[in-house]
């Protein structure tokens, strides 16, 4: 059964494939399990006398509805854990902007998101269509030919990723 599940989840392009919030939407039990782990740990620590403020970050959001569906799971699980552990947790739910569509529609996502973070590695890969892992085979040549002035994985390319970040802000 495990081998069958592994084969079902095999991806042809893991960078753009079945991961992040997409995986959590299709298999909500994964998001539920992760949220439960966060809130149970937070409840245990807080019931031990230390104030905590967990921040749950939903990855790879490109559509507001993706985010909203995941937020519903997070809030439901938070309520269940707080009731079971008799604790009140102050928590935030936000997203990491990692795909161009997420940056371009950040105003919509912000209607629900309580915070944003930028995943500049993934955002660079998706904006430029370059794999960081493969870039060593061509980036030195690109620099030599002055196609790129700097390694876009070492510094933010202001003409692409930088502009996407400005739009999102």
Please provide the spans of the model-predicted regions.
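Conserved alpha/beta-domain cores
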Residues: 1-169
């Amino acid at each position: 059964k495990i081998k069958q599940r592994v084969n079902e989840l095999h991806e042809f392009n893991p960078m753009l494939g079945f991961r992040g919030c997409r995986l959590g939407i299709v298999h909500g039990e994964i998001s539920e399990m992760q949220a439960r782990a966060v809130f149970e740990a937070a409840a245990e620590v807080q019931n031990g006398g230390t104030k905590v403020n967990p921040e749950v970050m939903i990855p790879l959001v490109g559509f507001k509805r993706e985010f909203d569906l995941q937020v519903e799971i997070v809030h439901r699980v938070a309520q269940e854990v707080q009731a079971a552990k008799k604790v009140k947790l102050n928590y935030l739910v936000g997203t990491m902007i990692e795909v161009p569509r997420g940056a371009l529609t950040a105003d919509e996502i912000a209607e629900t998101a309580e915070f944003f973070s930028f995943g500049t590695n993934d955002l660079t890969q998706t904006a430029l269509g370059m794999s960081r892992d493969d870039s060593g085979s061509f980036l030195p040549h690109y620099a030599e030919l002055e196609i790129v002035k700097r390694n876009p994985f070492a510094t933010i390319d202001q003409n692409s990723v930088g502009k996407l970040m400005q739009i999102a802000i």
